[in-house]
Amino acid sequence: MILFPAIDLKDGQCVRLKLGDMNQATVYNPDPGAQAKAFEDQGFEWLHVVDLNGAFAGETVNGAAVDAILKATKNPVQLGGGIRTLDHIENWLARGLTRVILGTVAVRDPALVIEACKRFPGHVAVGIDAKGGKVAVEGWAEASELGIIELAKKFEGAGVAAIIYTDIDRDGILTGINWASTLELADAVSIPVIASGGLASMDDIRRMVEPDARKLEGAISGRALYDGRIDPQEALALIKAAKAKEIAQ
């Protein structure tokens, strides 16, 4: 069980969006490398990064900022946003990423995801971003008719390292994770699921370590961390204690 701090990149800066709207961006740190190092110093063991401009452009836009992050932290980094080809994946893994997140291309070309898992085993995750129960693509700008579980099941047995499931209706507004939908997805597939969107407070962390939620690989936190609604040391201690209890059972 992992708590992933999030760095969302827009125009080279760390921002948070409200409900996925690029016009509602709050800048939290103009220096992504410094933010990555700060999260490492707080005790986090992973980092979740999204190239927001890239998600809309269909190609990497904030490459220099991601490189700065990779240089600043020793922690493994997963990146989503604008990664659409096998060459993109190979390039980013060569530059030091641990895991790439494929979102739009997972809807448009599932076969590419399956091929990527074969070529880069253990390094490919799928991002499922949903609005109103349906999968959204192109930086959340377009809705599809595809259901969340329907898409996830396409990748059963393919070797996908994780599914990052984001509830767009809750993202960046601190209303709490959509636990019902997230756990339903986790029950439906054998692929590890990471919860994203809406993590609001220590209540979500306490919910995350309850027995039925321990099937998740973890959860992603953005605004709640930046706004000080989650105490990193307390959150990480809760997770560590839950892991120890699980091992002891």
From Swiss-Prot:
Keywords (A to Z) from UniProt: Amino-acid biosynthesis, Cytoplasm, Histidine biosynthesis, Isomerase
Gene Ontology cellular component terms for the protein in this record: cytoplasm
UniProt xrefs under Pfam families: His_biosynth
Superkingdom assignment: Bacteria
Compartments where located: Cytoplasm
Entry-linked Gene3D superfamilies: Aldolase class I
Catalytic activities: 1-(5-phospho-beta-D-ribosyl)-5-[(5-phospho-beta-D-ribosylamino)methylideneamino]imidazole-4-carboxamide = 5-[(5-phospho-1-deoxy-D-ribulos-1-ylimino)methylamino]-1-(5-phospho-beta-D-ribosyl)imidazole-4-carboxamide
Gene Ontology MF: a single term: 1-(5-phosphoribosyl)-5-[(5-phosphoribosylamino)methylideneamino]imidazole-4-carboxamide isomerase activity
Enzyme Commission (EC) number: 5.3.1.16
Main location: cytoplasm
Keyword Ion transport in record: no
Uppermost EC category: isomerase
Pathway: Amino-acid biosynthesis; L-histidine biosynthesis; L-histidine from 5-phospho-alpha-D-ribose 1-diphosphate: step 4/9
Cross-referenced HAMAP family: HisA
Similarity comment: family membership: Belongs to the HisA/HisF family.
Protein name listed in UniProt: 1-(5-phosphoribosyl)-5-[(5-phosphoribosylamino)methylideneamino] imidazole-4-carboxamide isomerase
Annotated source species: Rhizobium rhizogenes (strain K84 / ATCC BAA-868)
